Amino acid sequence: MNKAILAVAMVLLLAGCATKPEEIGRAPDLSPVAAHLGMQNNPQFNGYPARPGKASYSLWDQRSSNFFKDPRAATPGDVLTVIISINDRANLDNKTDRERVSKGIYGGGGSFATSSITGAAAGGDMDASVNTHSDSKSKGKGTIERSEDIRLQIAAIVTDTLPNGNLIIRGSQEVRVNNELRVLNVAGVVRPRDISGNNTISYDKIAEARISYGGRGRLSEIQQPPYGQQILDQFSPF
């Protein structure tokens, strides 16, 4: 009995856990710059080619090379702008009606007669039948209505080049306002030909696109149920 009371008390305590103790009274921390690009203590990117140096007494000025160079991102380390303009609407209305009725009658009959030593005869009829009936009904209805409108721009960096020339890009943006941190991430594979002349690309041109827009902080924690309640929801059969 004492163990049961202790278990119930522990569950109630877990239901009140809504935030991590180390985050109480603190604003969410920003991620390190270029954390996913392998940035070291010194400002150098691993695996990226170094910028060519300027030759002494050269007739060609490196500052003039951009006039003839394609401004679009093409090699690891280049930056391009991803334009996200999502305006999706979905209305789904599903209804199912299922009914099954099954009936069955199983029977049998017979007659018998017996005689005894005295010559007296006895007889009778036997009739046995079994009736079965089964009725099953199921009704379901579901309605989904969604509306999303997201318009953002984020700078992404080319992290790698595939053998066929396609580019792998990844971008991240974090903005902290008071104690709430807005996080925007984008990643995917793009074709160089889809990058426009002003070095921008639309989100619908990104293959294997991974776009996330959310946040973390006090407001996000309030919108989520406490950890204890989430555990109860996972194990509760009701």
Curated annotation (Swiss-Prot):
Cellular location(s): Cell outer membrane; Bacterial flagellum basal body
Lipid-bearing positions (N-palmitoyl cysteine): C17
Subunit and interaction comment: The basal body constitutes a major portion of the flagellar organelle and consists of four rings (L,P,S, and M) mounted on a central rod.
PROSITE patterns named in the record: PROKAR_LIPOPROTEIN (PS51257)
Transmembrane segments: none
Source superkingdom: Bacteria
GO cellular component terms given for this protein: bacterial-type flagellum basal body, distal rod, L ring; cell outer membrane
InterPro entries, per the entry: Flag_Lring
Leader sequence residues: 1-16
Family indicated by similarity: Belongs to the FlgH family.
Protein name: Flagellar L-ring protein
Chief localization: membrane
Membrane disposition: Lipid-anchor
Gene coding for it: flgH
GO biological process: bacterial-type flagellum-dependent cell motility
Role, per record: Assembles around the rod to form the L-ring and probably protects the motor/basal body from shearing forces during rotation.
Organism: Brucella melitensis biotype 1 (strain ATCC 23456 / CCUG 17765 / NCTC 10094 / 16M)
Entry coiled-coil feature ranges: none
Lipidation (S-diacylglycerol cysteine): C17
UniProt keyword annotations, A-Z: Bacterial flagellum, Cell outer membrane, Lipoprotein, Membrane, Palmitate, Signal
GO MF: cytoskeletal motor activity
